Design a protein with these regions (language model features):
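RNA-binding accessory domains that recognize and position tRNA/RNA substrates
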Residues: 3-7, 15-174
């Protein structure tokens, strides 16, 4: 489930009506950006918690295991990019399947977020979990391009931003 803001200037209807807002007639997705320390920017749509976050940008090419990766303490302070094109399709399993009792990444980047999990053991969808844990997440067009950029230019700091400014943060200096 994506986050939305009310667009009172929407030309398709009367956005002062409560029923129009509830029906989604006046909603637009919240946009954010991943900004790398070399100035490269990737724009995307939020599906996590809407707040700025900074860290080292890393990637994982695994096809499954995103709940385990997000709760893995070795990813603490990092913005995790998942390169597999479909993330969220099996939802979030029970806590007993996690690596730790909380999410450790400082942000998540994917290319195709699925908000309707289809696994019998799913307890919630990924976006809901990220919002509950206050972790920002963006769906960008091409995680392969981002991964190639990191591979070519080496380790890179980044930040997920919406409208506010935050400094870059290097978790390796803690």
């Amino acid at each position: 489930m994506q986050q939305y803001v009310i667009d009172r200037n929407f030309s398709g209807g009367d956005c002062s009506r409560h029923d129009a807002i509830l029906a989604g007639e006046c909603l637009k997705p919240v946009q954010g950006s991943l900004l790398l320390e070399d100035g490269t920017m990737f724009e995307g749509t939020s599906f996590g918690y809407e707040r700025a976050s900074a860290g080292e940008v890393v990637f994982s090419t695994g096809m499954v295991g995103y709940p385990e990766s997000l709760t893995d303490p070795s990813f603490a302070g990092q913005i995790l990019t998942l390169t597999y094109p479909i993330i969220g399709n099996y939802g979030i399993p029970d806590r007993s399947m996690w690596e730790d009792d909380k999410i450790h990444v400082s942000g998540l980047i994917v290319s195709n977020y699925i908000d309707t999990p289809s696994h019998v053991q799913s307890s919630m969808n990924l976006g809901t979990w990220l919002r509950e844990e206050k972790i920002p997440a963006l769906e960008i067009k091409d995680t392969r391009l981002l991964t190639k950029h990191i591979r070519t230019h080496g380790t890179m700091l980044g930040k997920i931003v919406f409208d506010e400014y935050i400094p870059f943060y290097d978790p390796n200096n803690d």
